[in-house]
Amino acid sequence: SVGMHIDTVMTDQNITLSNGNAGTVIDALGERQYGRVYINLGTNELGWPYIDTFKDYYTQLITKIQEIQPDAVIYAESILPVTASRSLQGDAINNTNVATFNQAISEVAQQTGINYLDCTSAVAGADGTLPEEASSDGIHLMSEYCDKWLNYIIDNT
């Protein structure tokens, strides 16, 4: 399946709502109030040449979530690192871009008054990259590493 993208996350109707109809993430968030909202976006945008455009979309999303979830604690999660071998493949999915976009997410979180969760330490090796055994494609986590990521979130929120 195709993941979500920061520029269309508020308009793509790819969520099944409680009434069975398709809706947006924003529609789903409007169905009830939550104590916490977690945002995990950015991997699909690693090739974007304009970081300010990414930050603008991210800010718009946070502002909208703050409007419809005024009492929720909102967390922006860092983009997880990729494996060293994946990072060296010569395209936009590399750990240099991950670091650049994570800095942007951190800045937006600070500017909008939400929490930034640096999840890298949950899954990265000593060198800061995703261990080769953590992923079959260098990007997406195997279940053991999903558990590490989830436990980090539970322990830190």
Task: Describe every region a protein language model picked out.
Residues 1-57:
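Conserved SGNH/GDSL esterase-like catalytic core that processes O-acyl groups on lipids
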Residues 51-61, 98-101:
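Charged helix-capping and loop-helix junction motifs
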Residues 40-44, 66-98:
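Active-site segments of SGNH/GDSL-like serine hydrolases
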Residues 29, 65-67, 109:
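N-terminal cationic-hydrophobic initiation segments that often serve targeting/anchoring roles
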Residues 23-26, 61-62, 102-103:
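A generic local structural motif
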Residues 81-157:
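Catalytic His-Asp segment of secreted/periplasmic serine-dependent ester chemistry enzymes
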Residues 35-40, 73-78, 115-118, 140:
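Structural recognition of the beta-strand scaffold that forms the well-ordered cores
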